[in-house]
Amino acid sequence: MRCKGFLFDLDGTLVDSLPAVERAWSNWARRHGLAPEEVLAFIHGKQAITSLRHFMAGKSEADIAAEFTRLEHIEATETEGITALPGAIALLSHLNKAGIPWAIVTSGSMPVARARHKIAGLPAPEVFVTAERVKRGKPEPDAYLLGAQLLGLAPQECVVVEDAPAGVLSGLAAGCHVIAVNAPADTPRLNEVDLVLHSLEQITVTKQPNGDVIIQ
């Protein structure tokens, strides 16, 4: 597979934030009389505000916004257990050394994403697309289209690296190549992605003299 740049999801792709996410959302579910497993099954890969609107249907936007602010603070400050996933730091460092453009494109808000990126010790991206920068979150294509644009690349020149069904669908809808890493077996359209891997450690990247990037 050939490309010119990478668009990485953050949670579940570059960082293991599952313990923190499950703590925050399970506590939120219990406070609202909901089954934690139902909430956790819905939220993966989606913007927090989308999940809150789903589970707080009928509530005012002011109530939902207040709940979002509270939850955002919890997720941005309670980072215990968050670590870089195997291969993440090595891959990003290699891209930087080779001069290959890459971005982080996440459904998380800026405070939450920045906190998790920092605690995991990841290299700084050239472009950081968070929930605030798009009107429609994953699985819509907006975030990945913006990421490609900010890198100065066409969507078809980019490879999206994702673990969540919503993110895989977003990358495909944007017209990007897609690598699914540790994605659920029942992910819709999984048969349409370019590669299905279990770990970032399986990705080998080589930059050609003409600027093309070969992924194996």
Swiss-Prot record:
Its cofactor is Mg(2+); Mn(2+); Co(2+). Optimum pH is between 6 and 7.5. Requires the presence of a divalent metal cation for activity. Can use magnesium, manganese or cobalt. A divalent metal cation binds at D9, D11, D163. The keyword Manganese applies. Its EC number is 3.1.3.22, 3.1.3.50, 3.1.3.23. The keyword Metal-binding applies. Keywords: Carbohydrate metabolism, Cobalt, Hydrolase, Magnesium, Manganese, Metal-binding. It comes from the Bacteria. Disruption phenotype: Cells lacking this gene show a reduced growth rate at high butanol concentrations compared to wild-type. They also show a consistent change in the level of mannitol, D-sorbitol, galactitol, L-tyrosine, 3-amino-3-(4-hydroxyphenyl)propanoate and N-hydroxy-L-phenylalanine. It catalyses: sugar phosphate + H2O = sugar + phosphate; D-mannitol 1-phosphate + H2O = D-mannitol + phosphate; D-sorbitol 6-phosphate + H2O = D-sorbitol + phosphate. InterPro entries: HAD-like_sf, HAD-like_SPP, HAD-SF_hydro_IA, HAD_sf, PGP-like_dom2. The active site is at D9, D11. Pfam families: Hydrolase. One of its GO terms (biological process) is carbohydrate metabolic process. Substrate binds at D9, L10, D11, T106, S107, K138. GO terms for molecular function: cobalt ion binding; glycerol-3-phosphatase activity; magnesium ion binding; manganese ion binding; mannitol-1-phosphatase activity; sorbitol-6-phosphatase activity; sugar-phosphatase activity. NCBIfam families: HAD-SF-IA-v1 (TIGR01549), HAD-SF-IA-v3 (TIGR01509), PRK11587.1 (NF008610). Belongs to the HAD-like hydrolase superfamily. CbbY/CbbZ/Gph/YieH family. Sugar-phosphate phosphohydrolase that appears to contribute to butanol tolerance. Catalyzes the dephosphorylation of D-mannitol 1-phosphate and D-sorbitol 6-phosphate. Is also able to dephosphorylate other sugar phosphates in vitro including ribose-5-phosphate (Rib5P), 2-deoxyribose-5-phosphate, fructose-1-phosphate (Fru1P), fructose-6-phosphate (Fru6P), and glucose-6-phosphate (Glu6P). Selectively hydrolyzes beta-D-glucose-1-phosphate (bGlu1P) and has no activity with the alpha form. This is Hexitol phosphatase A.
